[in-house]
A protein has these predicted regions:
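Bacterial N-terminal signal peptides
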Residues: 1-3
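Surface-exposed interaction/ligand-binding surfaces
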Residues: 7-115
């Protein structure tokens, strides 16, 4: 897990978005994890290794460092996972857990169809 000291978590948001709901076998999709928290909190998010499976059948090709910005006293952290799969299937990717000041927050689940 990577750790970043950031915002005191009164209002915390964790959202997952995927840039393609369907890809061809071997193509890439990008899953963006967006975290919002008050400045000063400690944010801990998962770190994935190259070739690690996010879920069985969906492989992580790249795990970007968190890109941070300050907006109205809140940290906005964006992290991108580059994914691929070599099996034709509809995959349900569960919410990703992030800790803010020791409290767990989970993103929304996303789906990826490989055709």
């Amino acid at each position: 897990m990577s750790s970043l000291t950031m915002a005191a978590a009164q209002q915390v948001g964790v959202e997952a978005k995927i840039d393609s709901v369907a890809i061809m076998i071997g193509e890439q999709a990008h899953l963006q994890l967006a975290i919002t928290a008050r400045q000063g909190a400690k944010i801990v998010y998962p770190h994935y290794k190259r070739s690690q499976y996010l879920v069985p059948g969906v492989e992580v090709l790249d795990d970007s460092k968190g890109d941070t910005a300050v907006v109205d006293g809140y940290w906005s952290v964006k992290k991108i996972l580059t994914l691929t799969s070599f099996d034709e299937q509809l995959y349900a990717i569960p919410g990703i857990t992030v800790k803010v000041d020791g409290k767990s927050y989970k993103s929304n689940p996303v789906a990826l169809k490989v055709i």
